[in-house]
């Protein structure tokens, strides 16, 4: 309901935000007090959302301290931020928490949290791109030694100020992530950061303005500034860029705040004036994202309904489900969500996704069933043996000598018609799907 209300009011809405610039160090309480003062000031100014930079919690003296001070998202320290959100009726973008992974404490995630005015987490994004640089005798900065890369894309989140795409710092150099967020409906892009002094001087504003212009989005970039310890210094210059590429708010190089008005009707106007996304040549190039779907309901397979508990993996374009009458142990089907009979009916994006998903499922099945061979087959049309007029890929793990002189194709063409091959029960199929779902 909340998301629906936002979408109805965002189109012409104007919203006031605060962007915070900090100099975090290894004193967590001092960092919190600095953030608290800024959040309180934003509350007094009736801001709807406050943006804090990457490493708002702390910046350690060394790799070991970065690891040792990491915390859970529901710890006592984070509860203080949730209480501030509730107290001031304000949303928080907490740009980069050192988020401890219980299964791998030596490599925390760098997590961007969105907390609503009730203190509830609305989104968690783990930084995808880690900055690793080693030039012998000159510089060594290996983020992967004390942090772990995220493994999934997080769709833009509905907030009171608009639909917000989440990124962190180094992610700004990878335009595909911003493009994906824009295509998923983002009106704003956020880049909480701790840019180094040299790269900040050269690229900070240029990168932020580029992401704003090419995606026709507001860009909000809260930043660290100044000397955190004798070994580390950040550039500062937190800023807000409008979708035309104009810097509409900016801090200098000290601990400070800047404020900006987000006018979502301006986003709509610019996109109407320059409809660049409708001019993209998707017939020549495309952006494929390996994205899992959060959809949990059943789906159509031609005229048949596939129950949700028989589906073990899905993306925005494809889904994978267990077989009613498997030819081999582990025989599953991959199908596009859109009901079309022929492979040639699929878009390029659907085709790419279908076969990428098939490859992932094949790898999982081979490992689980301890086999090294797989038959992957599309029966494209009635004369090719297709009995259900909906494109689907058969994935069949193979064992040595299982079908004599490789008679698998004859078996596939007739297995639905064999009276001795009894359909499995819903319970059997659901149990198998649970196993595969966990493995995927």
From Swiss-Prot:
HIT domain sequence ranges: 297-405
> Which cofactor(s) are needed, names only?
Mn(2+)
Does Nucleotide-binding count among this protein's keywords? yes
Q: Which Pfam families match?
A: CN_hydrolase (PF00795), HIT (PF01230)
Q: Where is the active site?
A: 54, 127, 169, 392
Q: Which stretches make up the CN hydrolase domain?
A: 14-264
Which transformation does this protein catalyse, written as a reaction?
P(1),P(3)-bis(5'-adenosyl) triphosphate + H2O = AMP + ADP + 2 H(+)
GO BP? amide catabolic process; nucleobase-containing compound metabolic process
Q: Where is this motif: Histidine triad motif?
A: 390-394
List the GO molecular function terms. Answer: bis(5'-adenosyl)-triphosphatase activity; deaminated glutathione amidase activity; nucleotide binding
At the top of the EC hierarchy, this enzyme's class is hydrolase
Q: Which UniProt keywords apply?
A: Hydrolase, Multifunctional enzyme, Nucleotide-binding
Superkingdom assignment:
Eukaryota
Q: What does this protein do?
A: Cleaves A-5'-PPP-5'A to yield AMP and ADP.
What does the subunit comment say? Answer: Homotetramer.
> Which named protein is this?
Nitrilase and fragile histidine triad fusion protein NitFhit
